[in-house]
Amino acid sequence: MVRIQDLSLAFNGQTLFEHLNLTLLPNEWVSLLGSSGVGKSTLLRLLAGIETQGMVQGKILFEPKVRIAWLPQKETLYPWLSIVDNVQLQAVLFGRKSVKTTEKAKMLLEKVGMAAHWHKPCSQLSGGQKQRVALARTLMQEVDLILLDEPFSALDAISRHQLQDLAFELLEDKSVLLVTHDPQEALRLSQRIFVLRSPETHQTALSAVILPEGNAPRELHQANLWTLQQQLLQELGGEQ
């Protein structure tokens, strides 16, 4: 679906990562961890086709007609718009809002448990509710690859667990690249996990792949996940 070949990124003369190679496959969750400032969020921006001020070398190759949606860490809902109009934002912005798009948006809000609030402005929502609306808007775009940048990091533990399960259920037929700082989140949701490393470690840009066993979303009490979590923490500790 997407191939990243020999990709390097530098800002103001400082190399964040170099010679990165990664292939994203259909219908798969891949998680990417790493220390702050190593370029994880910028990598998502590059995949989304958003310009960056850094110096980029290498290639990102897409299969024909691959559609991509990006859910950034920073809130992107418009507080003065209703929830349903935030979900159908593309139609609103480009003058294509219709009964059909509104009904589809309401259907997606029902899937994320927000149907009763469709008429409210987003300014009245809690953090967890906003993430549900953002997820519905992502689904509205009907894409193949979803880029998630720390989507649950601002939520309390219970809401985070609920939203993880909901996202996995609703995105089960999509490819997902998840940037997260939470090893447990990666282990619950992903088929493959990597740590992105800076060149200062004198290692390859990506760690060896970690492959959790069993079907996601997983229960964290599994003994093998505890071992993999320790492996991830050791890898991340080497990045500090």
UniProtKB/Swiss-Prot annotation:
SMART domains xref list: AAA
InterPro entries attached to this UniProt entry: AAA+_ATPase, ABC_transporter-like_ATP-bd, ABC_transporter-like_CS, ABC_transporter_ATP-bind, P-loop_NTPase
Coiled coil regions in record: none
ABC transporter domain residues: 2-223
GO molecular function: ATP binding; ATP hydrolysis activity
Residues that bind ATP: 34-41
Entry keywords, A to Z: ATP-binding, Nucleotide-binding, Transport
Family: Belongs to the ABC transporter superfamily.
Protein name: Uncharacterized ABC transporter ATP-binding protein HI_0354
Species this protein is from: Haemophilus influenzae (strain ATCC 51907 / DSM 11121 / KW20 / Rd)
